[in-house]
Amino acid sequence: MARYRCCRSKSRSRCRRRRRRCRRRRRRCCRRRRRRCCRRRRSYTIRCKKY
């Protein structure tokens, strides 16, 4: 199975589907690693990327 990590890519449609919301605030996590959350920033959102 593919693993995912957080990245700062804007155009990643694949990442959008595999993001999950974290319990803490509005942060979103990667499917495989729930501990690492993607934070929302001003101009972009950090998303999950395959590695």
Swiss-Prot record:
Q: What keywords would UniProt list here?
A: Chromosome, Developmental protein, Differentiation, Disulfide bond, DNA condensation, DNA-binding, Nucleosome core, Nucleus, Phosphoprotein, Spermatogenesis
Q: Does the keyword Nucleus apply?
A: yes
The subcellular localization recorded is: Nucleus; Chromosome
Concerning PTM, the database record says:
Phosphorylated by SRPK1.
Q: Name one Pfam family in it.
A: Protamine_P1
Q: Does the keyword Magnesium apply?
A: no
Q: Which GO terms describe its cellular component?
A: male germ cell nucleus; nucleoplasm; nucleosome; nucleus
Top-level division of the source organism's lineage: Eukaryota
Q: What InterPro entries does UniProt report for this protein, alphabetically?
A: Protamine_P1
Q: List the disulfide bonds.
A: C7-C15, C38-C48
Q: Where are the transmembrane segments?
A: none
What the protein does comes down to: Protamines substitute for histones in the chromatin of sperm during the haploid phase of spermatogenesis. They compact sperm DNA into a highly condensed, stable and inactive complex.
Subunit structure comment from the entry: Cross-linked by interchain disulfide bonds around the DNA-helix.
The family note in this entry says: Belongs to the protamine P1 family.
Protein name in UniProt: Sperm protamine P1
Provenance organism = Mus musculus (Mouse)
